[in-house]
């Protein structure tokens, strides 16, 4: 028995010593739900942080990693401090409010500056499309279109994953699991950063939230942004630029999204009907750039 206990203690000590330290700032506009997401991480994962002490730093344990999570303020003054964390960051988490259509233009400007920063370029970024439980929340594919993420990712060689989620206090643990899977994706990419980077956007087919609208079935069968919602987005945008014109100007192809299953390379010309065939054939959405 003593020998068995000694062996277990030795294994635990070895695990602690071999954990890789990873620094991940969590950023986004104010009221996007960053703090609630950090609280969800603390409930789902072992933590070394004293929850009674208010601090921007949270230390979490996930698999063989020890994560230093920085919850940074998203107001105008707080954003001035973001660049101080870029150099030491191994990857970033960007949280946005999927239902706050009026601020999408602001999010686009911030993401453009973020990904083009030399201290960020090439590093993976996990985008948490939060508040999917809200009635007017945009789907991840529509968010990618409007923010021109494909163009940004290709230009800056930043692997990117869009994870739909609904960070709600007192929500069941199982409904928060996709954000942990998104975090695992981020760590997996960080672990392979020594390899030549390949820039991509992937959309998780998982969905979290509450209510019928956010069930896995309803999420996989929604057809994308309706004409009315697209018009509403154009009207609510700060610069009020037509969405279709913006995308065509940037050379982004518009397509009908019948579900979340599509894989294609943008460097190759797409034939008519090709997208819908691939949507039926694949299980994961991933946009790859070579």
UniProtKB/Swiss-Prot annotation:
Domain of life: Eukaryota
GO BP, sorted A to Z: non-motile cilium assembly; receptor localization to non-motile cilium
SMART domains: ARF (SM00177), SAR (SM00178)
UniProt-annotated stretches for the region Disordered: 204-226
CDD domains according to UniProt: Arl2l1_Arl13_like (cd04161)
Gene Ontology molecular function, alphabetical: GTP binding; GTPase activity
Any GO CC annotation of this UniProt entry: non-motile cilium
Chain positions recorded as GTP binding sites: 28-35, 71-75, 130-133
Keyword line: GTP-binding, Nucleotide-binding
Stored PROSITE patterns: ARF (PS51417)
UniProt-listed PANTHER family: ADP-RIBOSYLATION FACTOR-LIKE PROTEIN 13A, ADP-RIBOSYLATION FACTOR-LIKE PROTEIN 13B
Homology family: Belongs to the small GTPase superfamily. Arf family.
Protein name: ADP-ribosylation factor-like protein 13A
Species of provenance: Homo sapiens
